[in-house]
Swiss-Prot record:
This is DNA repair protein RecO. Belongs to the RecO family. One of its GO terms (cellular component) is bacterial nucleoid. It holds the Pfam family RecO_C. GO terms for biological process: DNA recombination; double-strand break repair. Keywords: DNA damage, DNA recombination, DNA repair. It comes from Dechloromonas aromatica (strain RCB). InterPro entries: ARFGAP/RecO, DNA_rep/recomb_RecO_N, NA-bd_OB-fold, RecO, RecO_C.
Length: 242
């Protein structure tokens, strides 16, 4: 339970919002110093509400709240400007990031470094007018997210404490990290040592590294999401089938 009666001038981003009663919203925000918070925006759905147009995803805000309990009351929201609206692939990617944070971040658990990584990622997504997304940027954010949650990847040594060898094949096991295998041994998820080292160095110049790193991250996210299917991924699949 949140015991802080009032917080002012807190940098934050909207992750998700949904209607509450006739004229209000429950807004899930990611704040710099308090982590994920649930706030009641009273009257935000009224046509003349001063904050109705401000509570948008992917835009930097400065907010204030007051109250006690799990859902606090939003007192103020000011747009900090500077980011174009996301479009195309970047918009889907932004919603993907928000879903990850909604599902994986516990409430009221501060992650200042992750907040900075999220803000940087949004700036990168907004920087390309075509809405294209660099896979390298997405992999770096996913890696930072897991690190912040205490699920940091082991990428430079294997389960036997041996240094990762670029030309050796491994399978990645959640509780053990990279486990050396003979290529073709039948593991469901196989990754080159070079890919692990590239991911550690955040070097995605090799196309095969990008492909294998994507598969590895997808497996890890599925595990930590504990079976929850992300809406963004489902919608993207449906669009590809049209």
């Amino acid at each position: 339970m949140n015991l802080r009666s009032k917080v002012d001038s807190q940098p934050a981003y909207v992750l998700h919002s949904y209607p509450f009663r006739e004229t209000s919203l429950i807004v899930e925000v990611f704040s710099r110093d308090f982590g994920r918070m649930a706030l009641l925006a009273r009257g935000a759905r009224r046509p003349r509400s001063a904050i109705r147009g401000l509570l948008m995803a992917f835009q930097p805000l400065e907010i204030a709240w007051a109250g006690k309990g799990e859902v606090l009351t939003l007192m103020k929201a000011e747009w900090q400007g500077g980011l174009p609206l996301l479009a195309g692939e970047a918009l889907f990617c932004g919603y993907y990031l928000n879903e990850l944070l909604m599902h994986l971040l516990p409430r009221e658990d501060a992650h200042e470094q992750l907040f900075a990584s999220y803000a940087k990622m949004l700036a990168l997504l907004a920087a390309d007018p075509s809405g294209k997304v660099r896979e390298a940027d997405l992999r770096c954010f996913e890696k930072a997210l897991l690190q912040e949650l205490g699920y940091g990847l082991t990428l430079n040594h294997d389960s036997d404490a041996n240094l990762i060898e670029p030309d050796t094949f491994y399978t990645y096991r959640i509780e053990q990290g990279p486990v050396r295998i003979d290529h073709g041994e039948g593991a469901t998820q196989v990754v080159r040592g070079k890919t692990l080292l590239d991911l550690d160095a955040e070097d995605f110049s090799d196309p095969r590294t990008r492909h294998e790193a994507k598969a590895l991250m997808r497996m890890l996210m599925a595990y930590y999401l504990a079976g929850k299917e992300l809406e963004t991924r489902k919608i993207f699949k449906e669009l590809q089938e049209l």
